[in-house]
Amino acid sequence: MQRAPFQARIDGCRGDKSFNDAAAAGLDKAKKVLKVTFREVSATAGGAASERETKLRLLAQAGYNPVIAVGFLYADAVKVVAAEFPSTKFAIIDDASIALPNVASLVFAEEQGSFLAGVAAAKASKSGKIGYIGGVRIPLLLKFEAGFVAGVKATK
């Protein structure tokens, strides 16, 4: 059985020691363990939504299937491009707003992992002072914060 091309989309670039690196590690493992082939492309960090849309469209036109968008910032682009390519499967990580039959939403219970991080921080703190930096105030990171705070409070 010949495998279809596999496409992954990474927003930003490798080297952020966070979300994008975790996605890239998953791609690397899939390439090694599952023997899938993929093409990795990125839009300019902080670039226009139209650039994300163009990149996704080019991948779909090239026959990559599935096309995976990493991050909620791709929601608008995935919605537009997936509608144009109904035979192509799309997936988006950290967004569940797209109601199209060819789009899979890959979402997580962020507050559960951050709850455990809050517990670990509370147990490790010698001063009783604990901080959390979420970067930006968006619903996704507010869920992280709520889980972290709940974990800290549950430990006291």
Regions found by a protein language model. Give the residues of each.
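Extracytoplasmic "Venus flytrap"
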Residues: M1, F6-V33, R39-R52, F72-Y74, ...
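An alpha-beta-alpha
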Residues: L27, F115-K156
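Sec-exported extracytoplasmic/periplasmic mature domains
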Residues: D28, K32-K35, Q61-Y64, K79, ...
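Short, well-structured alpha-helical segments in soluble
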Residues: A49-G63
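Periplasmic-binding protein-like
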Residues: G63-G71, A91-I93
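Active-site-adjacent structural elements in enzyme catalytic domains
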Residues: D76-A83, K89, F108-K123
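Flexible loop/hinge segments that line or gate small-molecule binding clefts
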Residues: A83-V107
